[in-house]
């Protein structure tokens, strides 16, 4: 089957295709990842592990520019020995402060970027998904500590394509499945908006992470091409 035929069949079957850019040994290689049918079916049935949110078909509308539906819910809740309650809140409503984002980037060791550009990137994103830790001390009404611990964002043409960028989780919260949940729910939000062709960029050390989420490399040998200035 030709790649064009594959894309057409995927479009009519609502099977999203996901691509991933890999950087290996200082060279940049583009990998295309097709979402496995089992993952898609689990999303459609709302049975994805650790997800309490049901997927709904987006309502029909005549408006050309429909903004993504904002979703906020508790992903994790735990009580510490001293009675402090911590909740991890997932949000797709773009509630990310640029200074908090810069601090999170510092924690994961990313190079600093100008605050004005960070603010522009957030403003111009189609979806900004975030994870916040909210801690409530025992017996202290109204006294909450809110901290950004994870983020991923997506840009889109609002019709067919979206690209996931800047996936990061606070090192103190890594290894708890939060990055996996963040990506799964961001994908789910995009699918709710009928965005079926999703791309992302991945460093070599996290390729397996995306494979475990159901990504498959290079369908039909598709490669990405990049242009860089010579000076």
UniProtKB/Swiss-Prot annotation:
Q: Which PROSITE patterns match?
A: GNAT
Query: What are the protein's UniProt keywords?
Result: Acyltransferase, Cytoplasm, Nucleus, Plant defense, Transferase
- Which Pfam families does its entry note? Acetyltransf_1 (PF00583)
The record's subcellular location field reads: Cytoplasm; Nucleus
Recorded superkingdom: Eukaryota
Q: What is its EC number?
A: 2.3.1.48
The kind of enzyme this is, by top-level EC class, is: transferase
Task: Identify the residues that the record assigns to the N-acetyltransferase domain, covering every copy.
Answer: 88-231
The family database entries (SUPFAM superfamilies) matched by this protein are listed as: Acyl-CoA N-acyltransferases (Nat)
Entry annotated with the keyword Cell cycle: no
One MF term in the entry's GO annotations: histone H3 acetyltransferase activity
Q: Which family does it belong to?
A: Belongs to the acetyltransferase family.
Q: How does it assemble?
A: Interacts with the effector Avh52 from the pathogen Phytophtora sojae.
Anything else the record notes?
A: Plants silencing TAP1 exhibit decreased susceptibility to the pathogen Phytophtora sojae.
What is the protein name stated in its UniProt record?
Answer: Histone acetyltransferase TAP1
Origin species, per record, is: Glycine max
The organism's taxonomic lineage, starting at the top:
Eukaryota, Viridiplantae, Streptophyta, Embryophyta, Tracheophyta
